[in-house]
Design a protein with these regions (language model features):
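A structured, mid-to-C-terminal "fold-capping" secondary-structure block
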Residues: 24-26, 32, 129, 135-196
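Immediate N-terminus of the mature polypeptide
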Residues: 20-50, 54
């Protein structure tokens, strides 16, 4: 895990350094040809795999689908908390911390979103918003396989958010299939919420 974090940190720093060459507010697309190729690949993955799986997922009874979605949202609260601290938004950080504590203890590890019922609303943030607040430019436009379009800042920030996700530490000794299950569930859950 430490090697993974070191490699990602080096990549992250490389991407951040590359921002200095882009002072305008428009996102640059110097990789248009490869981005188009990856976009076509992602479309095929969506049509032949992700959409059919998401259709099946959406057939689950609503309480099960909601429970899975709630667990995934709950595991994101430590990421929200960390980023709000880095952004200097202490009130939002404490709200995220309280949501996590309440839903993890009284909400059956997040299956039930009790925090929402007592008016502690979810308010997502990520390291991309942190970097934006710190003044980092968006960088280049990238289309990432299996993920989709991102600015290079957003892509680098996704690596940081992944690194601080508590599930990585809870599942570090598990088989690969178990470690990727939350990410796969998140993708399927998000896709089923965006059916066209």
């Amino acid at each position: 895990m430490l090697k993974f974090l070191k490699i990602n940190l080096i990549f992250f720093l490389f991407v951040i350094v590359s921002y200095s060459s882009y002072g305008n507010s428009e996102i640059s697309d110097p990789y248009e040809k490869s981005n188009r190729t990856v976009h076509e690949f992602n479309d095929k993955v969506d049509v032949y795999f992700l959409r059919p799986v998401s259709v099946g997922y959406s057939l689950l009874p609503n309480p099960i689908e909601d429970g899975i979605s709630n667990i995934l949202q709950n595991t994101g609260e430590p990421i929200n908390f960390t980023n709000y601290i880095l952004q200097g938004e202490i009130k939002n950080a404490l709200s995220s911390l309280m949501r996590f504590v309440i839903n993890s203890t009284f909400g059956l590890f997040g299956v039930i979103d009790l925090a929402d019922k007592i008016n502690l609303k979810q308010n997502d943030t990520d390291f991309d918003k942190t970097l934006e607040k710190w003044g980092a430019e968006e960088g280049n436009y990238l289309v990432i396989p299996f993920i989709g379009p991102r600015s290079s800042r957003h892509f680098a920030s996704s690596i940081v958010d992944l690194a601080i996700n508590p599930l990585n530490y809870l599942l570090k000794d598990e088989d690969n299939i178990i470690r990727v299950t939350p990410t796969a569930l998140y993708a399927v859950s998000a896709r089923s919420g965006n059916m066209d």
